[in-house]
Amino acid sequence: AEVDGTSIPLSCNGKDMLTELYRTSSSDYPRFYRMDVLSRLAFVAFELLQKAMGEGTLSGCDAMLFNHSSSILSDRKHQGTISVPGEFFPGPATFVYTLPNVMLGEVAIRHDMKGATSLIILPEKDSTLMSQMVYAAMLKSSCPDGMVAGWIDCPDENEFEAEISIYKHNHNNNGRTDT
């Protein structure tokens, strides 16, 4: 794991690494242990960003995340509970995470974010397209503190990527908003 180019030493890999990062960055949110891997990844990424930027930094922000895999891990887990007719026991705790926007709900609640949240599924990570979409959204945003945006993808419990940043409004001399 790395934050702002600084490596964070860890003793675990895969989804266990997320739990280790959670314990070192913030251990006061017991719901973390009920989350799916995608939500844990987003949660830890936002915790590390908040820690780097300062307490309360995220509350006045919108959030726009991108990924390719949507909520495939939870989708597969849920499918496993409904595939066999005689063993049809779907659970709400699994089903809720088949909605990929739930990860944004988890971090928005945690950081008291009052702005808009969006998850956009892309065929692949495309930094240019993502920047264009963030810029367009910020032109219409009413959130004073900008937008948390980036790539959060989790195709497998042991293979995932999170890269997020805060994009700030920059009001230049003619009143136009730049990002």
Task: Give the label of every model feature segment.
Residues A1-T179:
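Conserved "HGTGT" condensation-loop signature of ketosynthase/thiolase-family condensing enzymes
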